[in-house]
Amino acid sequence: MANINFGFDHHAKKLYSGAIENSINSQLVPMVIETSGRGERAFDIFSRLLRERIIFLGSPIDEHVAGLIIAQLIFLESEDPERDIYIYINSPGGSVSAGLGIYDTMQYIRPDISTVCVGMAASMGAFLLASGTSGKRASLPHSRIMIHQPSGGAQGQETDILIQAREIEKIRHLLEDLLAKHTGQEVSRIREDSERDRWMSAVEAKEYGLIDQIFEKRPAPKSEE
């Protein structure tokens, strides 16, 4: 039996080697104290952001992370199917299957999805950034965005390796087709540009069609204008 793994994991592991243990799950998560007529109540920062319909993707993407993101998306749709959901992305990418699970859920639920790159959206992170609702995909000015082809490795019998190679090629075609759909680029250009790591600034990502806007400063509330 072949020992097979493929996806965007290689890039994520390369960037985060020695640092994954310091991911968001193992850090001290800040608490927010909220005061109401019933007294004080403490929330972890991510639960508090979720109340504002904000999801933070700040780690490599694996099945566990995907499960959490998918659950939050479905919950927020059940709370209000008409209000936008905001996903802030700072991720080096990760598993294709896990990322596609998030992608399919983003397309499936009713609310518009606003995606924002804060820091880096690479590999599957860039794919999810581009997959937000058209007109509602953004980046902060000094973020970096990177696209590339899926990588994979297999060992075992020759027939198993050939089967896996064909599967990787199918996945590559699928991702190229979807990225072309969301960016407006030709599939042939997506294939050429993703042959190797293609890094972009926020301005370049906007020109490419990965995002629609560059946020430099949050607008003041209307009452302050």
Swiss-Prot record:
Entries under CDD domains matching the protein: S14_ClpP_2 (cd07017)
Any one annotated GO CC term: cytoplasm
GO MF entry, a single one: serine-type endopeptidase activity
Subcellular location: Cytoplasm
Protein's UniProt keywords contain Isomerase: no
EC number: 3.4.21.92
Extent of the signal sequence: none
Catalytic activity: Hydrolysis of proteins to small peptides in the presence of ATP and magnesium. alpha-casein is the usual test substrate. In the absence of ATP, only oligopeptides shorter than five residues are hydrolyzed (such as succinyl-Leu-Tyr-|-NHMec, and Leu-Tyr-Leu-|-Tyr-Trp, in which cleavage of the -Tyr-|-Leu- and -Tyr-|-Trp bonds also occurs)
PROSITE patterns noted in UniProt: CLP_PROTEASE_HIS, CLP_PROTEASE_SER
Sorted UniProt keywords: Cytoplasm, Hydrolase, Protease, Serine protease
Pfam families linked to this entry: CLP_protease
InterPro entries on file: ClpP, ClpP/crotonase-like_dom_sf, ClpP/TepA, ClpP_His_AS, ClpP_Ser_AS
Active site per UniProt: S123, H148
BP GO annotations: protein quality control for misfolded or incompletely synthesized proteins
Family named by the database record: Belongs to the peptidase S14 family.
Role of this protein: Cleaves peptides in various proteins in a process that requires ATP hydrolysis. Has a chymotrypsin-like activity. Plays a major role in the degradation of misfolded proteins.
Subunit and interaction comment: Fourteen ClpP subunits assemble into 2 heptameric rings which stack back to back to give a disk-like structure with a central cavity, resembling the structure of eukaryotic proteasomes.
Protein name, as recorded: ATP-dependent Clp protease proteolytic subunit
Organism: Chlorobaculum tepidum (strain ATCC 49652 / DSM 12025 / NBRC 103806 / TLS)
Gene: clpP
